[in-house]
């Protein structure tokens, strides 16, 4: 129905392009007129446009500086400060409107200027990443359209080879004229450096400065790069610099400016694929015990082996029953226990390809899932532990607990959590206990709960490491280290770590050195970081399938830009086989056929393991080929460059999907162009589209097809029953293949199901983080205020006034002069001894006023004794150190709250609502503690004598060394959104790792580690070289 309407009225994309066409015509007319100008004349035109843009904004900038100057006056009244802040808010809105207005006015001239600059640069030879490059690019009309879409704050979807990098220069140039700074976000350091060097000639021709932020840069270098008109960098670098700026000890340490305009390259990768993993700065946990996994690993090792033997016996039982009674319920139950006990068992996966068995297992599972899975325990009780592969959770059964207690020679109760509420109630009701004894017994209960919950958590993580994470799939082991493989790109993520003890569990499993734990010090999600920008835009080859998410989360519209030349690539229906073995044999046969013909083929794989399996099979057939995966990625540029040559065979993980351009060799067009052969479907349609997009660039011929088997991960977990039943009905023999549009559509529906589930995770992540985001804004605003002011005396006095009122109010009902005197001496070092009867004579307000005057007099004496500069440092230290310390503690409490909040679903409560209420209560307490401790420190802190100063300096150096060990963490939201769809069901307590695990990016790689820039070289031979 929708397609009929589009044919009659035109699609949304057609209408978007139609609106832009008149401006494109105007740009081309202007560019023709600019051709008559001399080079100096064109540069003069650029200066005029810059002058127009900055001239329109200058009066508002001057007004802002004037207001900020008034606001920084030391003793400005509170009412005046509020009025100025309101005026600044209004001015900010006017400033944004003025920016939009002036840029719309000069857009046609600026785009025409950039186009003519590109024309004049043709033939210009310069260096990009150490290689000579000749400029040969002038924007086409479709690229001008893409540039206008980006400038308007939307997403421009452009096919591979359509020149997205050149398109970006148009809106970058236009917005850089304001002097407010434009950020260009790429997926790795290598692309940031390459794109900066590649496009710099256009910008420098007109005097615009261009910078790049790289992982290895020091803060002073970063500050210089951010001061440029245009700054390239990765989303991680921009995000971590934001967090580091909000941990800075002085204004001079801050590196970033305001967030004005960001253009995100490969926007779907950055804003969607990585949006499940927040950015986190973390530091080492003091006194962390890393031996706990080594202690329990032998038990888990034995437990897993016993489970494997048990599963094997169930498989044998099922086979026996099926020989005489096909479709028998007992056989289905035995196979269901195998699925719950060891879902990745190869013998089980092979059995499922037999006619009717997949349907039997599904039917049996549905029977036990009825009534909120109330009977599923009948299946699981016979196992040592139950695995829910789809949700990523593992649950230890009573049988498993008994086995572990016998193995560890301990009571099985140690694997059960005590009911803290009931235990505390019993202690409270015991009249024979004194208050001190009650406190002691309560502490013992809390300690017992903490010890047991930690042990159970470690057991769960080790079981996950053994059952759900496979070497050469989710991770590889290199140089004695566990290295995570990015599921979307197939690249190794140097220095990143899973969180929540999972990485340590995998290290224990692989018998490598177990690294230390970390704790969160600052965090922000990708979504909330990019919301800081006044204007956001993005470009990619694959955004349309996620258009609704882009709009709902970021308010970004997607516009599909027409190609310069029609795409003639042939996309064929999927070829479906029963087993992986049949599929791999068919892949090898197809590759052999294509190589004999001379047509180059790119075989896309989803994991390192599959790429190596296919490579072994091709070697067996003596077919020459290249392999590009996380283990061999150091030859990436060389392999990709040769992939389009005649007879080339290239096996690649998803690495070859982005940032690569495969050009065809001579004679290849006549053979049909590059052949894309996908060895399985990815869970995201976008990744498959990226792979197909490697062929058919700029009107080149090409072909693409996916080979799929029912044993593939996607089909096993989410495959439609319809596909299985069709295979069964047709009674296919071994090696037979199904090729039908209906099958392809069923597979795409399975992918859509996964995408919807992942969207739910990201949306839930945002709902939870929005709570923390509001709190973060308040804390960072207070911190910035403390950082920028020379003196904070008026802020201290405001806190003092509130403190005096609060303290006196507490003693209003039961006035205790001695306790009040002791408290003031302890908290402020102020002596204040109220006489008896003072409360009756003066009342609460009178006493509060006297207390305020006494404390004020104390502070005034302190100000006279201490030089003003030192006094300013004391106030600043009091504010910043307390905020930093308390915010770290608050983040730890919020993490703990998130971990257990889904259990509230048992009480028929909405976990999100409960989380909001609890987080607000914690935040109110946080603000009260910050105010009290800041005031206390400002009053009690005095300069030290020279000996003490030297001791403090030594401590500060030690602290500085500790700070250097800070690690930047890219953390997945697993602990918050455990089992999102089922948080209200009986599985809520199994809160799972639905979605990616937490990842931690360490601050600096080792000399022999892979360089994080993506070049493929070792760090010591790349960005780690000494200057």
From Swiss-Prot:
Enzyme Commission number: 7.4.2.8
Cofactor remark from the record: May bind 1 zinc ion per subunit.
Gene3D superfamilies (UniProt xref): 3.10.450.50, Helical scaffold and wing domains of SecA (1.10.3060.10), P-loop containing nucleotide triphosphate hydrolases (3.40.50.300), SecA, preprotein cross-linking domain (3.90.1440.10)
Classification via SUPFAM superfamilies: Helical scaffold and wing domains of SecA, P-loop containing nucleoside triphosphate hydrolases, Pre-protein crosslinking domain of SecA
Membrane topology, record value: Peripheral membrane protein
GO cellular component: cell envelope Sec protein transport complex; cytosol; plasma membrane
SMART domains membership: SecA_DEAD, SecA_PP_bind
Record keywords, A-Z: ATP-binding, Cell inner membrane, Cell membrane, Cytoplasm, Membrane, Metal-binding, Nucleotide-binding, Protein transport, Translocase, Translocation, Transport, Zinc
GO MF annotation terms: ATP binding; metal ion binding; protein-exporting ATPase activity
GO BP, one annotated term: protein import
Residues that bind ATP: 143, 161-165, 661
Keyword set includes Nucleotide-binding: yes
Subcellular location: Cell inner membrane; Cytoplasm
Reactions listed under catalytic activity: ATP + H2O + cellular proteinSide 1 = ADP + phosphate + cellular proteinSide 2
Protein name: Protein translocase subunit SecA
Source species: Chlorobium limicola (strain DSM 245 / NBRC 103803 / 6330)
Lineage, uppermost ranks: Bacteria, Pseudomonadati, Chlorobiota, Chlorobiia, Chlorobiales
Encoding gene (name): secA
